[in-house]
Amino acid sequence: MPLISTNILLAFITALLGVLIYRSHLMSSLLCLEGMMLSMFILVSLTTMNLHFTLANIAPLILLVFAACEAAVGLALLVMVSNTYGMDYIQNLNLLQC
C-alpha cells in the first residue's frame, strides 16, 4: 500500500476513534464525521485516478454531495438542540422523540 493511502487510512481511523471517544458533544462528533468524509473523498479520488476507470470518475462528486447533505442536517440539528436546551450534548437527542 502506498504511503499516501496509508496516511489517508490512518486519518480515517483517527476520525473514527474521535467519534467513539468524543461522543458526548454533538459538535465534536460532527467534526469527526467531516474528517471521515474528507479522508474517504481523497481516498476515492486517488483510487479512481490510479485505476483509470472512467465510469467511476463521478463517485467522488457523489460522495461530496452526501457529505454536504450530512453537514447541513448535522448543523441544523446542532442549532435546534442548542437553541432548545442551551447545550450540545448528544444525550439530549433522546428527548426529541415524538
UniProtKB/Swiss-Prot annotation:
It is a multi-pass membrane protein. InterPro entries: NADH_UbQ_OxRdtase_chain4L/K (IPR001133), NUOK/Mnh_C1-like (IPR039428). GO terms for biological process: ATP synthesis coupled electron transport. The chain crosses the membrane at residues 1-21, 26-46, 61-81. Its EC number is 7.1.1.2. One of its GO terms (cellular component) is respiratory chain complex I. The keyword Transmembrane helix applies. GO terms for molecular function: NADH dehydrogenase (ubiquinone) activity. Coiled coil: none annotated. It catalyses: a ubiquinone + NADH + 5 H(+)(in) = a ubiquinol + NAD(+) + 4 H(+)(out). Keywords: Electron transport, Membrane, Mitochondrion, Mitochondrion inner membrane, NAD, Respiratory chain, Translocase, Transmembrane, Transmembrane helix, Transport, Ubiquinone. Pfam families: Oxidored_q2. Gene3D superfamilies: 1.10.287.3510. The keyword NAD applies. This is NADH-ubiquinone oxidoreductase chain 4L. It comes from Nycticebus coucang (Slow loris).
